[in-house]
Amino acid sequence: MNPVIFLVDMNAFFISCEMTRNSKLIGIPAAVAGNPQNRTGIVLAANYEARRFGVKTAMTLNNALKLCPTMTVVPPDHRFYRQKSSEVMNLLSKYTPIIEQSSIDEAWLDMTGTENLFGKPADAAKLIMEDIKENLGLWCSIGISEGKFLSKMASDMKKPLGITELWKRDIQTKLWPLSIKSMHGVGAKTYEKLHSLGIETIGDFANLKKDDAHQILGKFGLDLYHHAHGIDTTPVQVISPDDMKSIGRSTTLPEDLVDIEQLKYILLTLCEDIGRSARKHNKRGRTVNLTLKSSDFKVIHRQVTIKATFNTMEIYEAGYHLLKLHLNPKIPIRLIGVSISGFEDTSVPEQISIFNMDEFNKRDTIGNNRNEKIDMVMDSIRNKYGSDKISRASLIIK
């Protein structure tokens, strides 16, 4: 039996979530962004009406409003988006128990062997899409193939509300004519390198000798070569939320960034989510890990040990310090991630920090119970009145 893998990609997720509770946003340019009142922050999501004006995710709000002055802007409500994401995943579990959530708005489904239940793959995808639209008020695109890579490529081919099948037998006619720039995993730096060698399409890369692909891009080149030939045996992996060895968040940027002001805003947004999750599960971690993936797909992981904490600002300050140390202003960043691990039993007395950076250790946030009380108050207000009722001034980009 051949595998059947779906990639369900929620379209313009954050702003689509907002549209489910505010119908006035439907049909007009709208976006979720940092601070609508002060016209500061960055665009986290824009609907398709706004995108027609050139508005893109990660663009500064000020620039976005220059492109589309009539755009309606709403502040982010991450708790609400997590709730809607959970609703999506619960709905998807009706169709298969084998689900790998890759981000808040994407998941792979192993639909192998479900044809007797839901019909052919395209029919099953239509059922899922209509189920999500009718019951949750959200839009999605679904890619279908034998593997995760091709299903991901397929999901990008038709948005919004698209269903695309991309089987191995079709790669020469459907995949190979596409620009190498559109290949999942190829960033700006990689594209520049391949373009300089006359490699313009995925087919051009697929027709290289395997050794040449390796020589040009190293191990990453071999991965791309296999993917260009439809070879991907990576299984869909079910990750249990109960097996919590770490709490992390990451985001792939739609545009490569080098501006530390934009990156630190995104970092703090991720840390807000991590901190709230850690407090919800009463998990204090001692290791903060920062992940940066550059536009040429080199990945660095840097970590530091601090006093056990679930305080948002302590996690953020550790991550930001690592970001300042390891961000190269000449190398654009494609992905940024942060996590906390090394959880300790809250009944165990806190240990002395071995975070050996004198300047950092002098910061007021480290070991400051006042910040934990602030977190608790903010969590309480958000849980009772909504995430948009209170925000940190630190989340504003001036």
Curated annotation (Swiss-Prot):
HAMAP family: DNApol_IV. It holds the Pfam family IMS_HHH. Residues 5-187 form the UmuC domain. It is found in: Cytoplasm. GO terms for molecular function: damaged DNA binding; DNA-directed DNA polymerase activity; magnesium ion binding. Poorly processive, error-prone DNA polymerase involved in untargeted mutagenesis. Copies undamaged DNA at stalled replication forks, which arise in vivo from mismatched or misaligned primer ends. These misaligned primers can be extended by PolIV. Exhibits no 3'-5' exonuclease (proofreading) activity. May be involved in translesional synthesis, in conjunction with the beta clamp from PolIII. The record marks F14 as: Substrate discrimination. The active site is at E106. Its EC number is 2.7.7.7. It comes from Alkaliphilus oremlandii (strain OhILAs) (Clostridium oremlandii (strain OhILAs)). Monomer. Keywords: Cytoplasm, DNA damage, DNA repair, DNA replication, DNA-binding, DNA-directed DNA polymerase, Magnesium, Metal-binding, Mutator protein, Nucleotidyltransferase, Transferase. Its main location: cytoplasm. It catalyses: DNA(n) + a 2'-deoxyribonucleoside 5'-triphosphate = DNA(n+1) + diphosphate. GO terms for cellular component: cytosol. Its cofactor is Mg(2+). Mg(2+) binds at D9, D105. GO terms for biological process: DNA-templated DNA replication; error-prone translesion synthesis; SOS response. Belongs to the DNA polymerase type-Y family. Binds 2 magnesium ions per subunit. This is DNA polymerase IV.
